[in-house]
Amino acid sequence: MKLAVLAVGHRQPDWVNEGCAEYLKRMPRELAASVTEIKPEARGSKTREQLLAAEKSRIRDAMAAGSRLVVLDEKGDDLTTLKLAKRLETWMQDGRDVALLIGGADGLDEEFKQQADDRLRLSSLTLPHGMARLLLCEQLYRAVSVLKNHPYHREG
């Protein structure tokens, strides 16, 4: 199974890319993970709907066919690390690749939210885009460490 973080946005600072790379390289082989940056649509005189439609097409092109669709959304499930680990375990049992979508400045097309297999919320706080990417990568690694009984995660 592969975990693909698909993030609409511009190039991130080195600390974001290096942090994500560090957590992703720690992932076990059976859970290969990657971050793919999706170029945002140039604003110009386009409406929000036009921007999101163009980005939707780019996201679809980057997704592996048949992937479980997980949307990061402010109204998504607010999970603890242990609950995320259980969710990840369920995804692993399903066997499909997982596409985790992080929308751009204007969010994600509503169709993604409606078709999502899961909707997750990283925080009630508004996070900078790069921080959301890094936090997601770290939490995916932490969830795996819980499942593997690795000492990275200490409970209580």
Swiss-Prot record:
Keyword S-adenosyl-L-methionine: yes
GO cellular component: cytoplasm
Entry-linked NCBIfam families: PRK00103.1-4
Gene for this chain: rlmH
Subunit structure of this chain's protein: Homodimer.
Reaction(s) catalysed (UniProt annotation): pseudouridine(1915) in 23S rRNA + S-adenosyl-L-methionine = N(3)-methylpseudouridine(1915) in 23S rRNA + S-adenosyl-L-homocysteine + H(+)
Intracellular or extracellular location(s): Cytoplasm
Biological role: Specifically methylates the pseudouridine at position 1915 (m3Psi1915) in 23S rRNA.
Enzyme class (EC, first level): transferase
UniProt similarity note: Belongs to the RNA methyltransferase RlmH family.
Record's protein name: Ribosomal RNA large subunit methyltransferase H
Species of provenance: Dechloromonas aromatica (strain RCB)
Keywords: Cytoplasm, Methyltransferase, rRNA processing, S-adenosyl-L-methionine, Transferase
A GO molecular-function annotation: rRNA (pseudouridine-N3-)-methyltransferase activity
Pfam families named in the record: SPOUT_MTase (PF02590)
Main location: cytoplasm
InterPro entries: Alpha/beta_knot_MTases (IPR029028), RlmH-like (IPR003742), tRNA_m1G_MTases_N (IPR029026)
EC number: 2.1.1.177
Ligand binding (S-adenosyl-L-methionine): 72, 103, 122-127
